[in-house]
């Protein structure tokens, strides 16, 4: 059997659909975010990064870098094992306590990523509670979908942010059936924000747990950066919160925050937690420093809001197809995978602007887009240059997408 031909066949299909993913080879410039060096066939060029999830630029913050350097000098590079076998350093213990405090929960549990946290927790909850029925928003992240699927239990998908549809589904479940509503606070591709209070109302009415993914909100929203639930004053009503250390906090890793019994049960039964090496101590130290800083500082959040408001306003003035939403995400609709990649390739090669095309399966076919993420450190001149470049490209739209392909190839 020709196994290689099977691989090539699938790759060719991606190329034909225009959604084969190409990674940009970047080296970020420490202390000079959002600039980076882009390594390509034509050489190395400086670019401005417009699509990073390092939303607040905390990966570059001196307090985070200092904490990581100090941890390496104190304990070395790796953790040395799983959490159960020598891999629980004091940094991990302190970080979990800080996260529990951040979200107002009894406990927190660290994972190597928020993807693993979602996957492991949601699948393990179904093992711990046989017959658990899951009610999941249709736009939930792949990690949540995978965790629900692997659990193998009964699930119902409700229309995105549709409270009436969710209640219709909840009404059909027997009162004594264990239930959990799984949703996100900020949906990263559209920028929509969930009606958390209304969902909590339904959870209380029908006796369901709530599981909230705050991955794209922690650090960015709320008086101490705990997310949308904190901002809206409903954090105490959410049973389990999932978060990341890799976006707003600028480092790496994921976690859940919940009751002591819930976290202990996941700690004791989730394979994705048990059978993997723990986060490096320096990572934990950096995340700890970032969280502590953002609990006290409003500077980064205030500046982010202003930058996002500026970018959205200028895009609207330029009549660019920016998708309206109340969050920090700035999606610009293209609607075709080939066209989308051609536009982003042209931005990179001709304008030294890096933004990644977002295609299926991340978004539905026909809704391909660019996803811009302004940060506190994007300057007025960088914003003006971006708007000018996009305006030039959109002015060329009548000549068809072939013109973008030609420009990108030059």
Q: What name fits each language-model region?
A:
Residues 122-142:
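Conserved PLP-anchoring active-site segment centered on the Schiff-base-forming lysine
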Residues 2-6, 12-75, 208:
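N-terminal "arm"/small-domain region of PLP-dependent enzymes with the aminotransferase-like
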